[in-house]
């Protein structure tokens, strides 16, 4: 049987289930595939096949995460579900699966629990833009307790709004009942997917964003000038476009006089392509790896930011000992390592391996940074943590 080609006839969205342990994230994931498989839009995946998750590496950190694919009438979804709380923290912080939106699963019998709150906070810090809530285990609530569910909903809406998620749709249902084939609860899963279709917008494609390419290498070609190479992160660059070189030194403006790929001249380079750009009036010593070349004024150099960080455990190849304010590791952004000084928040004495923490960083050189950007923290050539910029200070 020949391998099917990937049909790109629907917009693609990345989503994931988040929420407290045992509130039904994996059962819901299975119930979604069961429900949509009935419409010929998914292959049914049972609980054990999702729960038996492959390991993946993101920035040197092992994450157990299961990826499930399915479609609704309008879209193609890639859905990530993690078994353990630590895996969610790592997955969200490293951006192993960048989520365009999340389904927050909350048990109606428990309401919001510590990990519910932590996952909402993490979602905000790492820039998950939209959340749809599935209030699970509704079948366990007796009629006389029905108004408790209204209280749980109000509390959830408040909690979400506090973290900047206003007006999230809340769908009540039972993942287990839907999985067992109960028609009324299957309808609830359909309602959930309709809410996901309607409330999680299709993200802007990388190609439509302002041009940016992290520089990996610099060459000079005699008689022609300086060429910078790299993979275009977003946008499009054309011959004779004005661009800026940002980071590590003073920002410079120049003009692209040539775009090359595999030694062939092109009229333009697009997001995802590895290209060489010939730059007018730039000497080989004016530019270095780690700078970015971008649409003028679309990104600025910064040195101070707040970040959400996951610190690797010893068993994951991380540090064996805690660190304190004043710690000076290397921060790895795109194609460059820059030393930075850590300042822990008030009341936090030290950070232990395995911690999930927020702190401030002061870099010794400016780098082109943006909120929501991911980075690795290294020490002596090994990764000891991963983070996301939650706020730029200077």
Swiss-Prot record:
Residues 19-26 are annotated as: G1. SUPFAM superfamilies: EF-Tu/eEF-1alpha/eIF2-gamma C-terminal domain (SSF50465), P-loop containing nucleoside triphosphate hydrolases (SSF52540), Translation proteins (SSF50447). Residues 81-84 are annotated as: G3. CDD domains: EF_Tu, EFTU_II, EFTU_III. NCBIfam families: EF-Tu, PRK00049.1, PRK12735.1, PRK12736.1, small_GTP. HAMAP family: EF_Tu_B. Monomer. This is Elongation factor Tu. The gene is tuf.
């Amino acid at each position: 049987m020949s391998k099917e080609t990937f049909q790109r006839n629907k917009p693609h969205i990345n989503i994931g289930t988040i929420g407290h342990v045992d509130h039904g994230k994996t059962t819901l994931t299975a119930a979604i595939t069961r429900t949509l498989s009935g419409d010929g839009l998914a292959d049914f995946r049972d609980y054990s096949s999702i729960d038996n998750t492959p390991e993946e590496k993101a920035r040197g950190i092992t994450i157990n995460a299961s990826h499930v694919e399915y479609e609704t009438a309008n879209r193609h979804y890639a859905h990530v579900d993690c078994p353990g709380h630590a895996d969610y923290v790592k997955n969200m912080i490293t951006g192993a699966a960048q989520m365009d939106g999340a389904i927050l699963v909350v048990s109606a019998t428990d309401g919001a629990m510590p990990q519910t709150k932590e996952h909402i906070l993490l979602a905000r810090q790492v820039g998950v833009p939209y959340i749809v809530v599935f209030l699970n285990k509704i079948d366990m609530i007796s009629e006389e307790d029905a108004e408790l569910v209204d209280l749980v909903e109000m509390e959830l809406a408040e909690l979400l709004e506090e973290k900047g998620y206003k007006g999230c749709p809340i769908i009540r249902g039972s993942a287990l009942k839907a999985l067992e084939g109960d028609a009324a609860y299957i309808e609830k899963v359909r309602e959930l997917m309709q809410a996901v279709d309607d409330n999680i917008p299709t993200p802007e494609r990388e190609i439509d964003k302002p041009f940016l390419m992290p520089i990996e290498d610099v060459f000079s070609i005699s008689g022609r000038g300086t060429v910078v190479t790299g993979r275009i992160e977003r946008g499009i660059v054309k011959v004779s476009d004005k661009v800026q070189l940002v980071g590590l030194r003073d920002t410079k403006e120049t003009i692209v006089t040539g775009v090359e790929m595999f030694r062939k001249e092109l009229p333009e380079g697009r997001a995802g392509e590895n290209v060489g750009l010939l730059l007018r009036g730039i000497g080989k010593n004016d530019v270095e790896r780690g700078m970015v070349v971008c649409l003028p004024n679309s990104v600025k150099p910064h040195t101070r930011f707040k970040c959400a960080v996951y610190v690797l455990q010893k068993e994951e190849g991380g540090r064996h000992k805690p660190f304190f304010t004043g710690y000076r590791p290397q921060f790895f952004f795109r194609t460059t390592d820059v030393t930075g000084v850590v300042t822990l928040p008030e009341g936090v004495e030290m950070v232990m391996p395995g911690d999930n923490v927020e702190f401030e960083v002061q870099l010794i050189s400016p780098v082109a940074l943006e909120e929501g950007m991911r980075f690795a923290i290294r020490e002596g050539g090994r990764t000891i943590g991963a983070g996301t910029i939650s706020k730029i200070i200077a």
